[in-house]
Amino acid sequence: MSVTAPQAPSCILHDAGTCRSCPHLSVPLPDQLAVKQSRVSSLLAEHVPADLWRSPALSAPERFRNKAKMAVAGTTARPTLGILDGTGHGVDLRSCPLHETAIEEALPVLADLITDLGLRPYDVPTRRGELKHVLVTASPDDDLMVRFVLRSRRHLERLRAALPDLRRSLPQLAVLGVNIQGVHQAVIEGPEEIVLTEEDRLLMRL
């Protein structure tokens, strides 16, 4: 009985040239795997006989990434969550097919929160703004940890006050935190972490 190999996910961001984080997306997964297997076996040929290699296993082609590190850009009214282009401006990747469904469904809610609270995205070229990143982690139970990376403590109490409303909009929220990263560097997180919920960790069942 033949087994149909999983195909690479369809991604409108890749097709439009908006995002090139997955440069081999147009190559069929079995072909990608064959190339990788060939390279590895060639590198280890002196140490591993060819007959000892087992057939490689294909992983899930999409919905396998349980953590999203989203750079925030754009404006308060129209924030982008994703990456920055070569000029430091935002490219929205909320529809990235690699993220688990719980994360993809949470990102629009968090974007609305940014607008509702007036959190100004940090603009790299001008070095102005407060909100640098939104980090979202999903557990196997679809519970979420959300962390806002801010330039300062300026909006800390605003986020704390919004927690009840956010829980209603995002019932799977388990942990909400703020990280302070006040330097103009390509560093996602700073040294100061402030947890706004009673829970301070996400249960990851094995």
Please provide the spans of the model-predicted regions.
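Accessory RNA-recognition modules of RNA-modification enzymes
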Residues: 1-206
